[in-house]
Structure formats: structure tokens, C-alpha cells
């Protein structure tokens, strides 16, 4: 293969040093001219096994599909929780298996899942990864490896969140806003392992989103195709870019708050719990 490429390069060089003189029909070697060379299709590597395509894949489209499927799964869980809440409100005699603590926990997890783990992941993670490179003319995100890591951080965050349903005491029931210090006080539903797993999940989610958000912003600002100014960008890309900037300003504060509340819970610090 290497010898064939070498022979082709030699032939292109020979062609570039010769050109036919239109007036005399003779070869004029003094004119520096390169004939347009036909370039064959380039074979790009595409993984075919499940692990190569869905685990270690750095293709923005595949990552967008991964975000979409994971977000839809969390959305289905949130939908089931909303059914249980409405069942308790509409037919309390039929929902005897639900206590007041269960209702608080379902409201908390439904709100957190829908606002953070479903909408953000679906519209920014899913549609953002799939549409941004297509609409700005980029081959891929500027940092494909970081893009892959951002999804798996989100996936682990969802796994930790779902694990909180199966710990003693169940998930947190402090409300989806998680106001401190009520969230970690004894007597609040899920104030044990439930709130701890929620805080860990939020921290992982924000770290993963930060990696993905920086990727979006740099791709939009630096990897647009030639001629596409910011004023010529599609409104869809503008919407994703604006939402990403707003989230990048808000989520770091959420991360710090989650870490401080975790330290209050585990190490008995006094960021929110002044009695310690």
C-alpha cells in the first residue's frame, strides 16, 4: 500500500512539472502548475462491536443518541412517579400503600428528575450533540474524548440517583429544591443514605455537564464552517448555546452547594448546620 501511494505521488509530481503550451502544443516545463488530482474516498474507522460503538465511541451523533435514550429512561421513571402522585391526590382510598413520607419522596424525585436529569440531558445533551456539528459544519465536537466522558459521568449520576430508591429509608423527600439545612435534618424523609446519594449524583451530573458545556461553547465559537458568522448561525444552535451559557453560570454554584451539604452530612462540618 505504501509503495502504491509513493508511485502515485511521483506521478502527480511529474504531472505538475509539465504542462501543455496551448499555442504551440509542446510541453513547457517552466510553468509551475499542478493538475487537479482525484482523491479517493478516505476510509474512516468505525467500530462494529458493541463495546467500540456504544461504550468507547467518541462520535457526537452516537453520544447524542446515548444521551437521548438515558434521558428518556429517567423521564419514564419521573412519569411513573407523577402517576403515583396523582393517584394519591385523586383516589386516596386506592393508594393505601403510599404514606405521607412516600408522597414527599415522589414529589422530590419527580421534580429533580424532570428538571435536571430529563430536560437538561435531552435537549442539551441529546439534541446538542446530534445537531451542533451538523448545523455549524464541523466534523465533530472539538474535544470528542471529553464529550464521551461527559456522557458517562451523566450515566453514573443517573445510576447513583436510581440507587437511592433502594436504600433504607428510600430517596430524599425534602423537596426538589433541596433547601438546607432541612434537607439533611433528622426527621426529613430520606435523610440518611437517600439524600447522600442525591448529593453525590448532583455533583457527578454537574461535573459531566461542565465538560459537555465547554465542548459545546468552543465548538460553536471555534469550529464553524467558513463563512458562517454568528449572525448566520441557525436559531437552534443559538438556543442551545444560550442555554449552555446560562447553565454554565448556574451549575457551578449548585455543585459547590451539594459538596458543602455532603460535608455537613458526612464530616459534620458547619457550612449549613451551625450547631456543629
Residue ranges of predicted features:
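Membrane-embedded and interfacial regions of multi-pass energy-transducing membrane proteins
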Residues: 4-6, 12-276
